[in-house]
Amino acid sequence: MLTLTRIRTVSYEVRSTFLFISVLEFAVGFLTNAFVFLVNFWDVVKRQALSNSDCVLLCLSISRLFLHGLLFLSAIQLTHFQKLSEPLNHSYQAIIMLWMIANQANLWLAACLSLLYCSKLIRFSHTFLICLASWVSRKISQMLLGIILCSCICTVLCVWCFFSRPHFTVTTVLFMNNNTRLNWQIKDLNLFYSFLFCYLWSVPPFLLFLVSSGMLTVSLGRHMRTMKVYTRNSRDPSLEAHIKALKSLVSFFCFFVISSCAAFISVPLLILWRDKIGVMVCVGIMAACPSGHAAILISGNAKLRRAVMTILLWAQSSLKVRADHKADSRTLC
């Protein structure tokens, strides 16, 4: 027998807790990604040449700032403006569409970063692969422009796929024990189709990311076997670079899979079952993932680590000066 899920209301305590967690996640995510952006952008202001990896990190931080902003707007929408009788109002649809596009650009940039790591760290023996690695290193700016172009194309196609369908309501009456009325809205299905369509466009960069990460893993294995045979020195710059790059890529893979699963689960939770608490949990998971990867990127990048140490030393010296000033003022009194 077919059973329907009743629409559950969300208490004020749950909404307040979710909003508080969302504010914390937004603050942490905004600060970490804004830090990555400002450190690299400051070099641009000083007219210093950015490395290829710094250019990718600059673009990646911008896309994640958009992601965090959209997820925070989604949290505000869920807690204050969204009604369970009509969960997909126009503003929430726009937030979801923009999030899908920003997430798509984020994946393309991660694939570009993975290719860059491969071109720098892997020692190729085949002539074609050597030429390809050299081409990737030289054409990174064009690749970033291509990512922006692909994101714009995906934006147009997703918007066209969503808004080209008719938006009307089909009502089906099911006679059950309580004579419940089930409303199926075609616009809900349109959003789900657009969601699937955008995820299909994510397959090429995801495969590119997996292939390049796999090649880097194989290269690390070969390098470790070579070290065991020819040297006993445990400290090797190339090995450390391989490990840092793989740590960044593996963490992105884990965070991206978790975030994508949460996003995919949130759609039927919202459209079919009207489970706002489940959607809140999914949005919280989606907001935590970019912050975690940004923290790993900061810990694995020498320039960003130096900037963090500079800020910490400045804060420590400022606190010490204030403490000494207060002690001197008390002595004078």
UniProtKB/Swiss-Prot annotation:
Pfam entry (one): TAS2R
GO cellular component, as recorded: membrane; plasma membrane
Transmembrane portions of the chain: 18-38, 56-76, 95-115, 143-163, 191-211, 252-272, 277-297
Stretches assigned to the Cytoplasmic side: 39-55, 116-142, 212-251, 298-333
Any GO BP annotation: detection of chemical stimulus involved in sensory perception of bitter taste
Keywords: G-protein coupled receptor, Glycoprotein, Membrane, Receptor, Sensory transduction, Taste, Transducer, Transmembrane, Transmembrane helix
Function in brief: Receptor that may play a role in the perception of bitterness and is gustducin-linked. May play a role in sensing the chemical composition of the gastrointestinal content. The activity of this receptor may stimulate alpha gustducin, mediate PLC-beta-2 activation and lead to the gating of TRPM5.
Keyword Ligase: no
Native organism taxonomy: Eukaryota, Metazoa, Chordata, Craniata, Vertebrata
Glycosylation sites: N89, N178
Entries under SUPFAM superfamilies matching the protein: Family A G protein-coupled receptor-like (SSF81321)
Chief site of localization: membrane
The encoding gene: TAS2R38
Tissue: Expressed in subsets of taste receptor cells of the tongue and exclusively in gustducin-positive cells. Expressed in testis.
Protein name: Taste receptor type 2 member 38
Keyword Transmembrane carried by entry: yes
GO molecular function, one term: bitter taste receptor activity
Organism: Homo sapiens
Additional note from the record: Most taste cells may be activated by a limited number of bitter compounds; individual taste cells can discriminate among bitter stimuli.
Extracellular compartment residues: 1-17, 77-94, 164-190, 273-276
Protein's membrane topology: Multi-pass membrane protein
Family statement: Belongs to the G-protein coupled receptor T2R family.
Gene3D superfamilies in UniProt: Rhodopsin 7-helix transmembrane proteins
Subcellular location: Membrane
